[in-house]
Every structure is written in C-alpha cells, then in structure tokens.
Amino acid sequence: MRVMAAMSGGVDSSVAAARLVAEGHEVIGVHLALASTPTTLRVGSRGCCSLEDSGDARRVADALGIPFYVWDFSDRFREDVVDPFINSYEMGETPNPCLRCNEKIKFQALLDRGIALGFDAVATGHYARLKDGELRRAIDDNKDQSYVLGVLNDEQLAHCLFPLGDTRKPDIRKEAEAAGLVTASKPDSHDICFIPDGNTKAFLGNHIGVRSGDLKDQDGNVIGHHDGIYGFTIGQRKGLGLPGPAPDGKPRYVTDIDADTGTVTVGTRDDLRVGRLYADRLIRLDEHEGSTQECQVQVRAHGGVVDATVTIDDGVATIDLHSPLTGVARGQAAVIYRPDPDGDIVLGSGTICDTVSVSKLQPTTAGASSNS
C-alpha cells in the first residue's frame, strides 16, 4: 500500500510512520507548513507546526529511510481554520480549531493531494481505531482521540490509517526509544498552534478590536461592562471584570453570550447545568434521520461521556441528556457514540447550536448530578 505518513514532529506520528515502514508499505513522510509567515512559526515551542517540529520530522524520516516533504498549506489553513475560529468567537461560540484542522486540512486537503498523486491512504499518530469501517475509541482511554476525529466523513475514514490505536502511550515512547528516534522523549503538545503564547483573548482582540458590551445578571440587571464577547466562554469564572463579589458571595460564571446585543450574562454554577443540546452541521448522521436512539455524547476532547437520547430530525440532532452537563458552549462539537465492548463506536458528530438549561426542562428530563 502507498501511504502518506503525516509527520508532525512528535513521537506519536514518528512511531506511526516507523510501524508502516516495518510492515512493508511504500511510505513517504509529509510535514504540513501551516504558518503564513516566519514570525508566526513557533521556534522552540511544543506544537505541531514549528520550525523545530519540521526539523524533528525530517530527522525521523531520514532515520527510517523514507522520502520527506514539507507541503505549504498556510493559505488553506488560514482560510479553513484560523478565519472560521475568529468568526466563531465573534458569534459568541467556542470552537475547537483542532477538529476543524482535522476535517479541512489533515484529512481533506492532505488526502485530496495524496489521492491525486496515487497514494492509497493517510496515516497519522492519532489514538483511535478503525475496525470494519467504523471509527472506535483507542485502547488507551487516557489518550483516546476519537472525539477530535468525529468530524471525519465516511470517504475520509475509508482512506485513513491509525497505527497506534491498539497501543498505550507509555509503550509508544518505549518503542521510539528502542528505535532510536529523536522524538522519543519529546513532550506532547497541548496549545493552539497559531496562538503561540496561549493568550486567546489577546489574539482575538488583535483581529476583532474593541466591541464593548454589558455584563448582566440572571435578572437582566447591568452589573459591568466588557470590551468584546470574544473574551468569554460559557462556564468561565475568572477574568470576568466584575466590580465586586456577588451579593450572596457565590462565584459567578458566564452562562450566556448574545452576539446580537453584545451581552454577556453571568450566574451561579447551577445556572450552567444543561439538560438538552441541539446540534446542526451533522456529519455521518444522515442515515439516522428520523430516528431516536439511546447513545452516549461527548462535548469536550478530554471530557467524559454521558448517556443521552438522540433524535435526528431535519438535519438537527436533539440530544436529551440523562444527567446534566455544565459549561457547554455553542460551537463545541457533540460527538455521538454507541457503546461497544470492542471499543465505543463513533456514529458521527454535530456542532452545538443551542442548549436548554435544566431549569427550563421537566425535572425528569435530566438527572440531578452534573458531569463536567
């Protein structure tokens, strides 16, 4: 099989490429250059698109004896990932750019070019499994990345390889050390690659500018002001800019963001509890149109799952949670799973477009305990 190994410069993609070579596939290594200018490359940072990462990926490819290429997808990355990220915050949403990058860059732009060049598949170092054409959770629950792959469609999955899905992370590092790969002890990346200092608010402020609005309590009283809704996300507690503590002394959290009026509403933790989600922009859920199923839903990359009743109607998923979630924001992905003893199966995903608080639902719609 002719395989493109997407090599980020980290230990996971390095071992994935090494395994493919050992299995006898015809492999080339590809590193994606996503920064638009040299100043945005994160020299020395722990990420997936810095100059250091590119060099590490090249050294691994040389050690494996495979061709290595750097493909410039910076324009596509700006258009399909960075700009939508900014626009989403302008609309009061909280997007995950890594999911968008997987959907539009790593498994669309890269795959399209690879197929045009005669390759059969793209392989990455993601922790997930493909079995009988179904995307499943990885063996290593602590590293499972099926959530961030829930945005892939059937055609993309048909050309994917995830060589690490049956292995735990500590064993991957041991394998890299045994093979003498330079990335064996390299730390994992956790930040957003195009925000090198991790200051999302400053990044958005530089692109959007000041757009003042009001901070209100649950009764609609103005209790403060802000410079832009992009500085807030649902569930946020710190940095609200309130002039003083709440009268009852309880912490205050962001409970709603209204992009039309520029209003940010705050309340107690109880006000954050939601019992129903609505999701649109559905992926791989068309076959379930008109159906109601008992499933599980995950709304954060490193969050837990909750049981839910999912109804698909007219391209929108209504997700009734069996126990409440807190801090759920519009723009997050809701990935739907079907429990399975051989690894939970990803049925598909949608983008959360609305939520309903527990207080607005019948008491029996969602349970009494909260999950984060």
From Swiss-Prot:
Residues 143-145 are annotated as: Interaction with tRNA. This is tRNA-specific 2-thiouridylase MnmA. It is an enzyme of class 2 (transferase). SUPFAM superfamilies: Adenine nucleotide alpha hydrolases-like. GO terms for biological process: tRNA wobble position uridine thiolation. One of its GO terms (cellular component) is cytoplasm. It catalyses: S-sulfanyl-L-cysteinyl-[protein] + uridine(34) in tRNA + AH2 + ATP = 2-thiouridine(34) in tRNA + L-cysteinyl-[protein] + A + AMP + diphosphate + H(+). GO terms for molecular function: ATP binding; tRNA binding; tRNA-uridine 2-sulfurtransferase activity. ATP binds at A6, M7, S8, G9, G10, V11, D12, S13, L32, G125. The lineage of its organism: Bacteria, Bacillati, Actinomycetota, Actinomycetes, Mycobacteriales. Disulfide bonds join C101-C193. The active site is at C101 (nucleophile), C193 (cysteine persulfide intermediate). Its EC number is 2.8.1.13. It comes from Corynebacterium kroppenstedtii (strain DSM 44385 / JCM 11950 / CIP 105744 / CCUG 35717). Belongs to the MnmA/TRMU family. It is found in: Cytoplasm. Keywords: ATP-binding, Cytoplasm, Disulfide bond, Nucleotide-binding, RNA-binding, Transferase, tRNA processing, tRNA-binding. Catalyzes the 2-thiolation of uridine at the wobble position (U34) of tRNA, leading to the formation of s(2)U34.
